[in-house]
Structure formats: structure tokens, C-alpha cells
Amino acid sequence: MDNEENEVIDLTEILSAVRQHLLKLIFVTLAAALVGFTASKFLMTPKYDSSALMIVNTRQDVNANVTSDQINSATKLVSTYSIIIKSDTVLQQVIDNLGLNLTYAQLNKRVTVAAVDDTQVMKITVQSDSPEWARQVCEQIITVAPDVIKEAVEAGSVKVISNASLATEPVSPNIKKNTMLAAAVGFVLVIGIIVL
């Protein structure tokens, strides 16, 4: 019984303390949110993604009838083709073709290749602070990759089903998320100070 009374008293005291410092709580929360918004909007460099889709086939004659076994085999080949696309054989050629002032390792970090929902479709994504640069590099990758893959694997092919996109909105920073996170940190900080 005493424990219950103590808990009620403690909760009442906490709520009373919060009410006494309500203006401070609101001010700090809003100030923290403003800091988060300002940092995201003006201090962080926006990053843009450009993506293209390619479909993997186990045979070079893409017009022939395709069996379910061939589709399964093509799905398994996606990981192999992903490694080839990110290899220096492809990316160095992209660097040379576009005259990029980047090393292979630097470009490799900006490129991701992944299967789309465990299908035979690959998504190639290039990230940059310039949406046009990202699109150009992504477009060059899907231009160079098919011939390199065909030569390396000797059986099978890849076909572009969606060309490189031009981003209109950055993928990061997430201004709304960062603002809310900063506000939450400010709120919790003040609550902690009040309670302690």
C-alpha cells in the first residue's frame, strides 16, 4: 500500500515539476527542432540517387521461350552479375569514358547493385550530390555492363528495362526526420533535468 502511495506521490511531483517548467520545456524542444532543421537544410550536403533496372537472362537469345528453371538460374546469377558490375573492369571503363576525376575505389563506394525482391531484376543505383552526375554515371554503367558480363560469363545476358532516372528530390538528409529527432532529444533532455 505504501509503495502505491509513493508511486502516486512521485508521479504527482513529476507532473507538477513539468507544469512549473512547461515554458522552458516548450522553448528547448522548439529550439532543438530549429537546430535540427537548420543543420539538415543548410549544413548537410543533399545526396541524390539515380537508379536503373536490368533483367538477367541465362541465355543470350532473350526472345526464346524461357522456362521456370531458367528464371531460377537467372535469379541466382544476379549476385554474380552484381559483382561484375561493381568490378574495376566495368567501373574503370565508366571513369575513362566520362573522364571522371575519381579512383575506382571512390566510384565503387557510390554504386550499389541489388536484386529486386529476389527476382531476376537488378537495380543499379548511383549516389552523388549532383543528380545529373548520378544519372550520367548510372547510364554509363548500364551501357558498359552488358558487354562485359557477356564476355565474362559467356552464357546469359542482361537487358536494360528501365533507364537511369534523374532525381528531383534528395534521398538525404531527411529534414523532417532530423527535425523531429532533434525535438525529441531536446524534450527528453529537459524532462531528465526536471526529474533529476
Q: Language-model segments: what does each one mean?
A:
Residues 1-196:
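Hydrophobic and amphipathic membrane-targeting/association helices
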